[in-house]
From Swiss-Prot:
Biological processes, Gene Ontology terms: response to anoxia; sucrose metabolic process
Name by which UniProt lists this protein: Sucrose synthase 1
Keywords, in A-Z order: Glycosyltransferase, Transferase
Top class in the EC scheme: transferase
EC number of this enzyme: 2.4.1.13
GO molecular function, one term: sucrose synthase activity
Family statement: Belongs to the glycosyltransferase 1 family. Plant sucrose synthase subfamily.
GT-B glycosyltransferase as annotated region, ranges: 272-749
Amino acid sequence: MAAKLTRLHSLRERLGATFSSHPNELIALFSRYVHQGKGMLQRHQLLAEFDALFDSDKEKYAPFEDILRAAQEAIVLPPWVALAIRPRPGVWDYIRVNVSELAVEELSVSEYLAFKEQLVDGQSNSNFVLELDFEPFNASFPRPSMSKSIGNGVQFLNRHLSSKLFQDKESLYPLLNFLKAHNYKGTTMMLNDRIQSLRGLQSSLRKAEEYLLSVPQDTPYSEFNHRFQELGLEKGWGDTAKRVLDTLHLLLDLLEAPDPANLEKFLGTIPMMFNVVILSPHGYFAQSNVLGYPDTGGQVVYILDQVRALENEMLLRIKQQGLDITPKILIVTRLLPDAAGTTCGQRLEKVIGTEHTDIIRVPFRNENGILRKWISRFDVWPYLETYTEDVSSEIMKEMQAKPDLIIGNYSDGNLVATLLAHKLGVTQCTIAHALEKTKYPNSDIYLDKFDSQYHFSCQFTADLIAMNHTDFIITSTFQEIAGSKDTVGQYESHIAFTLPGLYRVVHGIDVFDPKFNIVSPGADMSVYYPYTETDKRLTAFHPEIEELIYSDVENSEHKFVLKDKKKPIIFSMARLDRVKNMTGLVEMYGKNARLRELANLVIVAGDHGKESKDREEQAEFKKMYSLIDEYKLKGHIRWISAQMNRVRNGELYRYICDTKGAFVQPAFYEAFGLTVIESMTCGLPTIATCHGGPAEIIVDGVSGLHIDPYHSDKAADILVNFFDKCKADPSYWDEISQGGLQRIYEKYTWKLYSERLMTLTGVYGFWKYVSNLERRETRRYIEMFYALKYRSLASQVPLSFD
């Protein structure tokens, strides 16, 4: 007998049924929430009250506990408690409970946000409120629905294209037109005007196949170029007879029986990418002597490693396509006339290790002229529109052509990329690195507390504009998009939120959108390689490294002296800001006597040689000195100024390996974790935050260890346990070291990254062409939002003065 289908009950019905079954118990629980008064409760607070009340008899309340465990927050406005329920990544429901009347009601996103706003303004805002909703524009676009599909957008698109766009002969015409549209600076590629129909294309491909089977496989394309032109085929199919034949076979197979894997492979072989612009305006962007400066860290390293790998892949593919074209990559950043001893005042700078990649610097300016000094990434918003116009002129001058791909980095770079891509009609790729909304909890609802210092109203608006305008989004991890079972992803946090007094976002982004792709970076393996590769070790740096770590001298480069130089080293290196939580690591270490017995602490952060201009860094400096005094850490800690020499930093990781130490990354949230990748690539056992990217990079207990910086006592115990185990059994250190290396080789290399980026550009370029993925309606909506809201907000950010 067939199983009986039963109706899925709504969240309100399930909660109502639980109230009916256990009214007294649930009144007691919700009364506890209400008694805490008006405010917001986080998930752990909700569960703590539940555990305290029902610890002895949980099974009876299991259905309700499941609902509560899926709750991410509660808004308490007595006698009401509203819950934001997240049954799985990317899926949200909202309910409200009246504790006095035992009434349960479901809320729309808009109703929930309006209720939440009462935390700030104390009353329901009955006036008309601007609501931002991108959902109607995406209703006709294909999207997956399973959580496991999040971040695999290109695979989904390939399946969709294969099934829908090639369902009959007529639907193949966009592919024909796409191939005919290919040219570079007026030079035709792939197909010429001799081919006017699909039948003509197939006929030419068959004749070309017949010819290629009759010549040696290594015959260069130049020997049959003219023959192919007569058939309607131009350069771009390959450099040798074998490679051209392979490409022809891919297309013939697609025309016969479309297949997602073949489609991706074919689109990856088509010449589409010769000129690339990469935008990263803020901070000090240079190749040396800048790491550790304000707003200057992992993003700079990421981009420099990215362009080296990308140029190599572009050169390889152009050669394999049989083309004689010189690619060009431009990294666009801000020119700083007051360059603070760096090359940031230089307009053009060749990227070392490349042939065709330059850093081009364009200054910020306003009606008063060029801004000479560094300004915080939080203060750049009034300059970006003029900056975009200046950048557009500069890149056209340098490239003598429109770019084929524009990649934005971080909020400011992504906004400039959006404006440029919109103006030039170019494919856009977005890389967030970090979305500040996640790093600063409740910075949306309590915007007034943050906005004067951080200007988040501008930044969150810019982020929404960029993520909805872009053609595809690259993230380093799944967590960046949609979090985990228990934590909300960075992009996911932009699905629905409110900025009281400005606007409500009722549908800001869809994490199931096929524009999302996980493409993880690696470390530069010429700099970061295992400590066991002794023939490559840079031992010439060892005297300098020993001076840094162990000398008895205190100066502007290193503070405090280690007493016992034989202990293993707990090592950490990061910017000195609140989220990186370096002071939290020092406090964790200071509180645990056993940890101090087992290991020394060496941190690299900030600059003792000059006073920081960054507000947050100034506060962290004061806190660090205070903690060192409070826990009497002199003799146990070495605090080193930020180190600018990447090559020496690579050897520094390996030197820590020699002490049988460990790298600790204690951030409250880390979008990816380049230092985690670097340390693991050097073979240094790595213990990192469970919040963000490191939770995916490290397999806990196999390729490293996870710690929760919000529970510092437990985190310290994990470190103690690690060093105790290593002391009892030295092979345990080797086991974690090798596990980390294995993980890197499988998933985190720049070669894998650049191959994927090239393929994504091909697939999304094709998708954009054949399905009119200009998202014209969306972009008109974005134009209005930019003109009426963003520009107004940016004009309110105070201009900086030299």
